């Protein structure tokens, strides 16, 4: 535990190593194959230990929404008065149950990673998310009480056009409208 570090207020728990999605820009999905998820029981035990030291359990992995039992883990942490804070979530894998668990866990912000402003460019980089899937995840998270959504985008991708960059602004605006309701 290092209180001076960037995540010093969290007890960090590695929930998975590697990634199953194979996004073309990400090394984790290629370097750390096959993906390995820690069991729910192992994660719960780590959370119990972590809650003895910190009130926030930081869940670490390349993509947390696909970790088996992650919603149950967030509920488990919330039931014990803690907050589960996952790293980035893939919007099309977020379930309503996970969104509610994150809201119950007093998360003020959650990060999703559309990466590109258009479905065309997301397909190019193998980040196969549709805008309706991204907006549905935003609706569920905001509806569950999450007050802020952080979005990860990249600019300068191969085949990117001006319209793709403009799409970042448009998608961000649509998500922002949901957050401000």
Describe the function of each predicted region.
Residues 1-7, 36-39, 52:
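Cys/His-rich finger/ribbon microdomains and the adjacent scaffold used
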Residues 44-181:
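Conserved SAM/AdoMet-binding glycine-rich loop
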Residues 18, 22, 29-30, 113, ...:
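Glycine-centered small-residue hotspots that permit tight backbone geometry or close packing
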Residues 7, 11, 35, 42, ...:
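Short, glycine/acidic-rich beta->alpha junctions
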Residues 22-25, 35, 68, 120-121:
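Short helix/loop capping segments that flank catalytic or ligand/cofactor-binding pockets
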Residues 25-42:
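Iron-sulfur (Fe-S) cluster-binding segments and ferredoxin-like electron-carrier domains
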Residues 2-24, 108:
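N-terminal pre-triad scaffold of radical SAM enzymes
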Residues 19, 23, 43, 86:
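Conserved, mostly hydrophobic/aromatic
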């Amino acid at each position: 535990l290092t209180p001076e570090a960037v995540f010093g207020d969290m007890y960090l728990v590695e929930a998975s190593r590697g990634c199953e999605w194979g996004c073309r820009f990400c090394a984790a999905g290629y370097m750390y194959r096959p993906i390995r998820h820690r069991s729910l029981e192992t994660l719960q035990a780590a959370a119990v230990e972590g809650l003895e030291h910190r009130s926030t359990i930081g869940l670490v992995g390349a993509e947390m929404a696909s970790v088996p039992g992650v919603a149950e883990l967030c509920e488990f942490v919330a039931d014990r008065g803690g907050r589960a804070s996952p790293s980035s979530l893939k919007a099309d894998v977020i379930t309503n149950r996970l969104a509610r668990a994150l809201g119950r866990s007093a998360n003020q912000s959650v990060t999703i990673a559309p990466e590109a402003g258009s479905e065309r460019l997301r397909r190019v980089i193998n980040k196969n998310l549709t805008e309706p899937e991204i907006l549905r995840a935003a609706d569920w998270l905001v509806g569950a009480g999450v007050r802020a959504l952080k979005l990860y985008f990249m600019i300068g991708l191969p085949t990117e056009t001006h319209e793709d960059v403009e799409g970042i602004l448009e998608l961000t605006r649509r998500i922002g409208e949901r957050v401000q309701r």
